[in-house]
């Protein structure tokens, strides 16, 4: 299972402060999907969501 793509339809800059952790395919926990999306903007290879909840 390669995970699922993050839903990155957010108004940037800034993310909502909701705490809905997701586990990225990089092994890191992100406080919400938006923060994972912001990390993806800095990368060549996007992180996907491995599972909902912390890693």
UniProtKB/Swiss-Prot annotation:
Organism from which the protein derives: Monodelphis domestica (Gray short-tailed opossum)
Subcellular location: Secreted
Official protein name in the record: Serine protease inhibitor Kazal-type 1
GO cellular component, one term: extracellular region
Function: Serine protease inhibitor which exhibits anti-trypsin activity. In the pancreas, protects against trypsin-catalyzed premature activation of zymogens.
SMART domains hit by this protein: KAZAL (SM00280)
Gene3D superfamilies xrefs: 3.30.60.30
Gene name of this polypeptide: SPINK1
Domain Kazal-like: 2-55
Keyword annotations of the record: Disulfide bond, Protease inhibitor, Secreted, Serine protease inhibitor
Record-annotated disulphide pairs: 8-37, 15-34, 23-55
């Amino acid at each position: 299972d390669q995970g699922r793509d993050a839903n990155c339809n957010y108004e940037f800059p800034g993310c909502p402060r909701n705490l809905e952790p997701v586990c990225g395919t990089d092994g890191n926990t992100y406080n919400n999907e938006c923060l994972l999306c912001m990390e993806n903007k800095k990368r060549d290879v996007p992180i996907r969501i491995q599972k909902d909840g912390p890693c």
